[in-house]
Structure formats: C-alpha cells, structure tokens
Amino acid sequence: MTELMRIAALFAATALAEIVGCYLPWLVLKEGRPVWLLVPAALSLALFAWLLTLHPSAAGRTYAAYGGVYIAVALVWLRVVDGVALTRWDVAGAVLALGGMAVIALQPRA
C-alpha cells in the first residue's frame, strides 16, 4: 500500500467515525429516533478522536489535510445514505479538496 493510500484510508475511517457520530444525534433530534442512539454516537466520536492521534503529522496539519477527505466522504454519504445525486460541482469540489489534502499530507519532510 502506498503512503498516499494508507493516509487516505486512515482519513476516510476518521471521517466516517465523525460523520456517524454526528449523524446519529441528528436522527435523534431531527427525526425523533430513539435516544439510545446517542450512546453509539458518543462511541463513534471517541473513535474519531482516537483515530486522529494515529496520523503522523502535527495536529494542525492533520486537521487541515483531513478536511479534504472529510468533504469527499461526506459527499459519498450524501449519495449512499441520503440518496441525493451528486452534481458535477460536488465532484469538482471533492477533487479540489483531495488535491489540497495530497499537497499537505505528502509534502517533503525536513
């Protein structure tokens, strides 16, 4: 597995944990779903925080690069979970964001 693939997979897992951790409370508050969903939401957000510690860069750089992957994963969620078709603007934005992530994450280390 290349370094970019490893970083992207870790970022994708991190984004998924964050999205699930935020989506479940949204279901409780917006859709009237059972309150017990807040328990797996809290666990998912704890997993999200732990996954962030596995990234090799300084926290600020990790968060900056992570943002690009989060955008792409959120758009996949929009399509798969919410059932909303992506526009070419969604795809273009995700490509730009992932390009920015790659520049930040793969910069030469001094």
Swiss-Prot record:
It is a multi-pass membrane protein. This is UPF0060 membrane protein Bcep18194_A4425. InterPro entries: UPF0060 (IPR003844). Belongs to the UPF0060 family. The chain crosses the membrane at residues 9-29, 34-54, 66-86, 88-108. HAMAP family: UPF0060 (MF_00010). The keyword Membrane applies. GO terms for cellular component: plasma membrane. It comes from Burkholderia lata (strain ATCC 17760 / DSM 23089 / LMG 22485 / NCIMB 9086 / R18194 / 383). The keyword Transmembrane helix applies. It is found in: Cell inner membrane. Keywords: Cell inner membrane, Cell membrane, Membrane, Transmembrane, Transmembrane helix. Its main location: membrane.
